[in-house]
């Protein structure tokens, strides 16, 4: 596990296009408290995050993630917690992020990105 890198971006798929809410910070263990995660409880207690915008856009195309409509680009800071590279079959640049209570949506530097780039009109 490494401390979140200072000023490095981390991308997270979010429910709405242009706003990250407290609901976007809920882990699987919080969303599904009665589920038995077994040996994966450590991963279920963190947030799925991605290292590049391209990875975020690619993951957003997966059927089980279609309910997510935006991408938050979070400028990370060491006090935001720890993260670990946890590659999956769908993404080699998948990270699990365990945020601290110092991560504050109202004060964090967050930019919002479109899931799909719209072609420019000619």
Give the positions of each predicted feature.
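Conserved NAD+-utilizing ADP-ribose enzyme module
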Residues: 1-47, 51-122
